[in-house]
Design a protein with these regions (language model features):
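Conserved small helical "lid"/interfacial subdomain of P-loop NTPases
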Residues: 42-69
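Sensor-1/coupling segment of RecA-like P-loop NTPase cores
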Residues: 3-41
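Conserved beta-strand scaffold positions in the cores of enzyme catalytic domains, especially
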Residues: 28, 42-46, 247-249, 326
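Short, charged, surface-exposed secondary-structure boundary motifs
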Residues: 54-57, 162, 334-341
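A cross-kingdom feature that marks ATP-driven nucleic-acid transaction machinery
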Residues: 177-353
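Accessory nucleic acid-recognition modules appended to NTPase machines
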Residues: 95-253
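A short beta-strand-to-loop transition that corresponds to the Sensor-1 phosphate-sensing loop
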Residues: 30-36, 49, 76, 305-309, ...
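Amphipathic alpha-helical "lid/sensor" segments that cap RecA-like P-loop NTPase cores
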Residues: 59-106
Length: 353
């Protein structure tokens, strides 16, 4: 109803209908995108994706596997229902990569149902998934005029397919709304299936690289940022707004810190969020060298969050220096699971859950 020109007529007709059948036991259900407030008494029921904690409890899996599953499915019930806990996560991915199974069909079918010409929208979503995130970049990639791109993007935002982020310079970037959409467009839109509907080992490997290096890493970065937000007051006596974008992704010397606050007492946070990576002495020397050029070591607070095994040398650093804080994966989960973090996790509109 949202953008229809005759919505007032629709609501008036609905009210008349309800008045006429007021003596009957009739239930009217309106299904669709988020509804505006209407004058007719009603109850709003919102369908939301599963959180990582709900996945862990429902499927009886570990914290780490629940994050894997959430990052793969975006917590969508239709996709979660196909997950087989008796086999490994990797085997589940291989099974899911088939053109006749829900992981492929859900996105394809919904685009056809939502849009008369899904190809135009597919082009923009594919561009977003591959790094073209500003209107100018999307226009250049697609060949569409900027006003046409803007119109398409606005529609996709309404359908819950695209989210927008404001950069520190005031510009807006657009991204696929959740991890499932991002993975689908990054790896499957242009992939050619085998004759039996499966995908080759090369496609699977590209899928897993994108999953580990981009999707999963981004989720763990959010966990690290959440830990910092909840623990910053125990580290610094100054008030620090951890959500201030000017403190995010700051290059200091040769190191890009995920968070850097350089005032009276500096706080530097580095997030090691790619599985299989590791913290090295070379990295620590670069961190120390970059942050002590203009101020002494003891005036800095260092926070190293990692999803990988913490080397003994880094534990030794944290024991010797009060201003070096090592945050292992177990601690990240302990903080993250203290409360429901739905607000941090992407939502899907009702028609897509």
């Amino acid at each position: 109803v949202g953008t229809r020109n005759d919505k007032n007529d629709f609501y008036a007709a609905l009210k008349n209908f309800l008045d006429e059948i007021s003596s009957c036991d009739v239930l009217v259900v309106l299904i669709g995108r988020p509804w505006e407030q209407i004058e007719i008494p009603c109850q709003t029921i919102t369908m939301m994706s599963y959180s990582t904690q709900e996945i862990s409890e429902t499927l009886s899996v570990s914290n780490a596997e629940s994050v894997n599953i959430f990052s793969l499915t975006a917590g969508i019930a239709e996709l979660l229902s196909t997950y087989d806990t008796s086999i490994s996560f990797e085997e589940n991915v291989k099974v899911a990569l088939h053109i006749n199974l829900p992981f492929y069909r859900l996105m394809s079918n919904k685009m056809c149902k939502c849009f008369r010409t899904p190809e135009s929208y597919n082009t923009l979503l594919y561009a977003m998934a591959n790094g073209s995130n500003r209107i100018s970049e999307l226009a250049m990639f697609s060949g569409y005029p900027k006003n046409k791109c803007d119109k398409y993007i606005k529609t996709m935002c309404e359908f819950g397919l695209v989210r927008k982020e404001l950069e520190r310079n005031g510009h807006t970037k657009y991204y696929p709304a959740n991890s499932y959409i991002a993975l689908w467009y990054k790896t499957l839109l242009t992939a050619v299936p085998n004759a039996d509907g499966t995908y080759s080992e090369d496609v699977y490997e590209r899928f897993m690289r994108s999953f580990n290096d981009e999707i999963l890493s981004a989720f763990y970065k959010e966990m690290c940022a959440y830990w910092l937000d909840k623990n910053i007051t125990s580290i610094s006596t100054e008030y620090i707004d951890t959500k201030d974008l000017s403190y995010r992704s700051v290059k200091v010397g040769d190191v890009i810190f995920d968070f850097a606050y350089e005032k009276k007492r500096a706080v530097y946070a580095y997030y090691d969020t790619t599985l299989g990576g590791k913290l090295t002495q070379k990295l620590w020397k670069e961190i120390e060298s970059s942050t002590t050029k203009n101020r002494p070591f003891y005036e800095n607070e260092y926070i190293i969050c990692t999803v990988n095994r913490v080397p003994d040398s880094f534990w030794t650093l944290s024991k010797h220096y009060d201003n070096v804080h090592i945050v292992a994966l177990k601690s990240l989960f302990a903080t993250y699971n203290k409360e429901d973090n739905r607000r941090m996790q992407p939502r899907f509109v009702p028609s897509f859950v």
